[in-house]
Amino acid sequence: MKQNRKNLPIILASSSPARIELLNRIKIIPSQIIPADIDETPNLRELPAPLAIRLAYEKAIKIASQIEESAIIIAADTVAAVGRRILPKATTYEEVKNCIKMLSGRRHRVYTGLCIIKKENDQLTVRQKIVQTIVKFKKLSDEEINFYCSLDEGIDKAGGCKISGYAEAFISFISGSYSNVMGLPLFETVNALTSLGFRCSSIMPAKMNYCHSAT
């Protein structure tokens, strides 16, 4: 009889609370969280989607090169853009305000580059995917903009807003993956993990209740 193979441990190459929460929603608990410290500056004339997938790959490959054990590394990078203009990950009140003003009454796109690397016996297998979601905000008043900025929830967020927070009240239209906007497209993540031999509850018999990551 063929024995079930134990899942490799999962390493999340990010300390993002949103990505940790999203993995927990699908019952994946990383055995390690190792943020990848890379330069996230866009290259000259680099477009949003290529930037997101490049940064995700650089994060994943950096962690893969640092570890000795076999594991599956999950990395992602989220970029918000209006047209070809990449919005910053806001670090100040003014940056948040400028981003929200730009998003007010307009459609923008959120791109998440996903890179999952399976490292086993020093062999690397890579899965990459870019996922796009279109989001439209209603026209915001100055009062709404100032109030949102006062919450500080847009700090360190792509495009200066936290979609799973108060900014959700601004959305008049969304097309695509909601989890993608939060920072990790779950449908594509599960598909990639499955293709790498990781057993996930969403596609396995009911008796398997969790996506167990070996520790």
Swiss-Prot record:
Co-factor requirement: a divalent metal cation
GO cellular component, one term: cytoplasm
Positions of transmembrane segments: none
Assigned keywords, A-Z: Cytoplasm, Hydrolase, Nucleotide metabolism
Gene3D superfamilies reported for this sequence: 3.90.950.10
Major subcellular location class: cytoplasm
Record's function text: Nucleoside triphosphate pyrophosphatase. May have a dual role in cell division arrest and in preventing the incorporation of modified nucleotides into cellular nucleic acids.
PANTHER family per the UniProt record, alphabetical: BIFUNCTIONAL DTTP/UTP PYROPHOSPHATASE/METHYLTRANSFERASE PROTEIN-RELATED, BIFUNCTIONAL DTTP_UTP PYROPHOSPHATASE_METHYLTRANSFERASE PROTEIN-RELATED
Protein name: Nucleoside triphosphate pyrophosphatase
Biological source species: Rickettsia rickettsii (strain Sheila Smith)
